[in-house]
Amino acid sequence: MIFDEANFSPGGDRYITVEFGNEMNLELNFMAQGLAGALREAGTKGLVETAPCFASLLVHYEPRDISYGDMVTELKSLIGSLGSTDEIELDSRLFTFETLYLDPWTKECIDDYREKLNPDKEYDPDFVARLNGLEDRHQLVRVHSSSEYWVASLGFWPGLPFLQPLDPRAMIT
């Protein structure tokens, strides 16, 4: 669901979480990315950094330079100036890289894990296929490899991308 108005929540004494909705879709991510860009461009006093995610933006600010209330006021103003997500322009690049599916090296690692730690563990590709109502691991590969992906966020592990398929039919849980 896309919220009618953004929700603002304090995170300790120097963070604000701005939530635009509670689902994964490009419109919400563009709002988070657009607000992050608008904050940088505005040169907002006290801004330390931003961390956009699928449907939210974490804002790190310096409370000695700007209060929580003043930062929320600034955020609301910038959200109002963003306009439609159809009009938001984001810098992006296209990367192509090889992806291995069902390779023997990964299977060997999973088999080793199962043997030593969890003999009842289902093979991951089979589990993901079953969880998503797909016929088998081969259909999983076809579905996953059928779309280009948008990097919606970078994760806690340096450089770990949180990906969102541009074709919603390739959305996998």
Regions found by a protein language model. Name each.
Residues 1-173:
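Conserved "landmark" site that anchors the functional core of diverse proteins
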